[in-house]
Amino acid sequence: MARLREFYKETVVPELVKQFGYKSVMEVPRIEKITLNMGVGEAVADKKVMEHAVSDLEKIAGQKPVVTVARKSIAGFKIRDNYPVGCKVTLRRDQMFEFLDRLITIALPRVRDFRGVSGKSFDGRGNYNMGVREQIIFPEIEYDKIDALRGLNITITTTAKTDEEAKALLSLFKFPFKG
């Protein structure tokens, strides 16, 4: 069992019940899934770029990503219908907790000039979005073997009803919020 999953059951759930006064432990918010998305606009000119992006995301997530394609042609961006424009991967259960553990304890502290993540990136429904500018903050990526620095978007989907509950949940997981 993942270290953070045990931590959630033993520490986070009782603390949230005490903080918000839930009547049942089933009401306590939990992390449902983590989605990693990498938009690769350069893939229009060079198909190899997409292969590198997919392999980077696979190393980071430990799971093969799905290539996302353009839904319609846009002449201004030089993309056609069904052109590959990015890749994404959805993590659930143990893989999700393992990734969150690596993100909080290893990757985020490796960000240059890191002062914490914004506490305002909640969507109003208890989900959290954050961007990572460089994929090299993850220890799985070797600096010498990458072709370009690529960022990715990380979405943490929770069952929380409000942003306040979601922030309390992530804070108890020792998520490094600013201030």
UniProtKB/Swiss-Prot annotation:
Key words, A-Z: Ribonucleoprotein, Ribosomal protein, RNA-binding, rRNA-binding, tRNA-binding
Pfam families for this protein: Ribosomal_L5, Ribosomal_L5_C
GO molecular function: RNA binding; rRNA binding; structural constituent of ribosome; tRNA binding
GO CC term (a single one): cytosolic large ribosomal subunit
GO biological process: translation
SUPFAM superfamilies: RL5-like (SSF55282)
Gene3D superfamilies in the cross-refs: 3.30.1440.10
Cysteine disulfide links: none
Assigned protein family: Belongs to the universal ribosomal protein uL5 family.
Role, per record: This is one of the proteins that bind and probably mediate the attachment of the 5S RNA into the large ribosomal subunit, where it forms part of the central protuberance. In the 70S ribosome it contacts protein S13 of the 30S subunit (bridge B1b), connecting the 2 subunits; this bridge is implicated in subunit movement. Contacts the P site tRNA; the 5S rRNA and some of its associated proteins might help stabilize positioning of ribosome-bound tRNAs.
Quaternary structure note: Part of the 50S ribosomal subunit; part of the 5S rRNA/L5/L18/L25 subcomplex. Contacts the 5S rRNA and the P site tRNA. Forms a bridge to the 30S subunit in the 70S ribosome.
Protein name: Large ribosomal subunit protein uL5
Source species: Neisseria meningitidis serogroup B (strain ATCC BAA-335 / MC58)
